[in-house]
Amino acid sequence: DSGRYKDGGFYRVVRPDNDNGDPAISVIQGGLLDTTELQAEDLVPHETTDQTGIKHTDGVLSLARRDPGTGSGGIFFICVGDQPSLDYGGKRNEDGQGFASFGRVVSGMEVVRKINAIKETRAVDDPYMRNQILVEPVVIKNAYRKDD
């Protein structure tokens, strides 16, 4: 609601052909491009898909994280296709807690798929993200919550 994603971007694409994790997933990741803007209050308590009932299906938005409770409102991803390994009990994280999903793309999935198909990536130090960080982030012009 604060408009903080305006001028943010999508900077990471993960597909089975470039995924360095197991099991392979397909997502685009984005949010704030300047992560120095992240604050401690941006951390979001972890809610599993078992608690919310929002499974990682095509177009679902979810918080990126390392450990539970380290997800930030400043960094999120969008599922491209169904990604059950990201749900509670899924095998993508050793802790089995999955990722905290919180919304869904209501229009524009064709754009999400085009972003996910971008092949031009840059070198990074983190081997987990090798071949996934875009040379040029795709800018978010606007993002907002749609009321029912």
Predicted regions: what is each one?
Residues 1-148:
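Cyclophilin-like peptidyl-prolyl cis-trans isomerases
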